[in-house]
Regions:
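Short alpha-helical segment of the dimerization/phosphotransfer core of two-component systems
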Residues: 61-69
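Conserved catalytic submotifs in the C-terminal HATPase_c
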Residues: 91-92, 116-124
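Short helix-loop "hinge" at the ATP-lid/N-box region of the Bergerat-fold HATPase_c
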Residues: 144-145
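Short beta-strand/loop element within the Bergerat-fold HATPase_c
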Residues: 151-163
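Short conserved segment of the HATPase_c
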Residues: 176-188
């Protein structure tokens, strides 16, 4: 009986961890959707007048986030079924193209920062689950919106090194203390205890789990300017239609 109870406890723990991972992915699209609704509300009330083209673009972007939420709810329902695991669909993905798309989606949250995107040349094609990569990068950008100094630049760039794709994200702040570089990826650890900053402390833990499941990695390292940066690595895709990923 004790052995059976241990098995049940392990299953319950695994299920709780899985649901924590997949439900966390709802937070970023909800935050982006809220930002677009705020922009539309400010325009409608005259607080911040906007051009008709901008209003149309914001409405379209908000509806895209609603679509993402619907897809992610389906993912959660799938993950909640008995015997299920974290759904992953690795496919060849243009790293620069998808990163640029996520940056554009997150723009309302980062409107108080100057964003520098060093798009790679030539193209970098990686093997990854696009939805999960979007989740990881979206969370990192949401973190920058919360913690990066207002008005200061947030920089993103990527390259190929040692046969793998690398993407970095940094700002001009003081960075994360070196002694916290590993602890911050543990579940329920937050970067700040400020009451005004919301968060569950599961985001970076989920990001590391997702990157690992895709054969990648996420870590923190010095940025060369006295601060720190997040570094993501992913495997390069094999040749696609005769074109090498490198």
């Amino acid at each position: 009986v004790p052995h059976r109870e241990d098995e049940i406890a392990l299953v319950d723990t695994a299920r709780a961890e899985l649901l924590s991972l997949v439900t966390h992915e709802l937070r970023t699209p909800l935050a982006v959707l809220s930002a677009y609704v705020e922009l539309l509300s400010d325009a409608a009330t005259g607080v911040s007048p906007a051009k008709p083209a901008d209003l149309a673009a914001w409405r379209e972007a908000a509806m895209q986030q609603v679509g993402r939420l619907n897809l992610q709810i389906d993912s959660i329902l799938t993950a909640a079924r008995p015997g299920s695991s974290l759904p992953l669909q690795p496919t060849p993905m243009n790293l620069g193209e998808i990163t640029g798309a996520v940056i554009r989606e997150m723009a309302p949250l980062l409107r108080n920062h100057s964003l520098r995107w060093e798009q790679p040349e030539p193209e970098i094609v990686v093997l990854a689950d696009e939805s999960r990569f979007r989740q990881v990068l979206g969370h990192l950008l949401e973190n920058e919106a919360k913690y990066a100094p207002v008005g200061e630049p947030v920089s993103i760039g990527c390259w190929v090194r040692d046969g793998r794709a690398e993407l970095y994200l940094t700002d001009d702040g003081s960075g994360i203390p070196r002694e916290d570089w590993e602890e911050i990826f543990e579940a329920f650890v937050r970067r700040t205890q400020r009451p005004s900053t919301s968060g569950s402390g599961i985001g970076l833990y989920a990001a590391r789990r997702l990157m690992g499941a895709m054969g990648g990695e996420i870590r923190i390292e010095p940025n060369g300017f006295g601060g720190s940066r997040f570094l993501l690595t992913l495997p390069l895709a094999p040749a696609v239609h005769g074109i090498l990923a490198t």
